[in-house]
Regions:
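Short coil/turn segments at alpha/beta junctions that flank glycine-rich nucleotide-binding fingerprints
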Residues: 24-28, 99, 144
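Hydrophobic/aromatic-rich alpha-helical bundle segments in the mid-to-C-terminal region
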Residues: 120-124, 128, 142-190, 194
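Hydrophobic alpha-helical connector segments
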Residues: 59, 73-103, 153-160
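Amphipathic alpha-helical segments used for helix-helix packing
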Residues: 84, 97-120, 169
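Helix-turn-helix
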Residues: 13, 17-59
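N-terminal intrinsically disordered/low-complexity leader segments
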Residues: 1-9, 150
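A ubiquitous short alpha-helical element
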Residues: 55-56, 73, 89-96, 121-128, ...
């Protein structure tokens, strides 16, 4: 009897392997051969699922973004205002090994997105979603009296996005120098400034 292959599961295994290779070896080290070996498949097994490396890399970024969004949804459930803002940001900031590895994936993705319209569009869509959500949390915090700053909610969302993405770069380049407590403290200090 022939073996039944779950193609969605196989794609996910390949994307997970890509994620691990990029985190370990960087974008240039993420060859189709390395990815296949990491996933435990023959090199040719990737082609039916991802005909090109760029498609696989784009899927890996999408996977990281989806994982982050799943964590954000879980951690912000039932929260509003500043508590929701803090929980959202804490899931993006590189506060543990998993999130540092995610930073190691998105940074080379940004480099590729500079010259690839599809990757740039994926990034733009992702950041637009985050900006919309952060702005809504800011508006809820302002309505609850938790934010008093005259800076508008969209501008606060810009600040928080820049802080989170910048922290990913800094920690990926020198993780030993930036402990999670420092980043969490910086976030708390910024949120305290918004109160007034």
């Amino acid at each position: 009897m022939p073996k039944i292959v779950d193609h969605d599961q196989r794609r996910l295994e390949l994307v997970d392997a890509t994620w691990r290779i990029i985190a370990k070896l960087g974008m240039e080290g993420a060859t189709m051969r390395e990815i296949a070996e990491e996933a435990g498949f023959a090199n040719g097994a990737l082609k039916p699922y991802f005909p090109t490396k760029d498609l696989l890399l784009t899927s890996a970024f999408g996977h990281v973004f989806n994982r982050t969004n799943q964590r954000i949804a879980t951690m912000t459930e039932g929260l509003s205002g500043v508590a929701a803002l803090r929980a959202f940001c804490a899931e993006v900031l590189p506060l543990d090994e998993e999130r540092v590895n995610e930073a190691r994936i998105v940074i080379p993705f940004w480099q590729k997105a500079l010259n690839d319209a599809d990757m740039a569009a994926l990034h733009s869509e992702s950041m637009s979603q985050w900006h919309t959500t952060i702005t809504a949390h800011c508006a809820a915090a302002r309505a609850a009296g938790e934010i008093a700053t005259p800076i508008g909610d969209a501008a606060v969302a810009d600040h928080l996005l820049n802080m989170m993405l910048g922290a990913q770069i800094v920690v990926a380049l020198s993780p030993a120098e930036h402990f999670s407590q420092d980043l969490a403290g910086q976030l708390d200090n910024y949120l305290a400034l918004l109160a007034g």
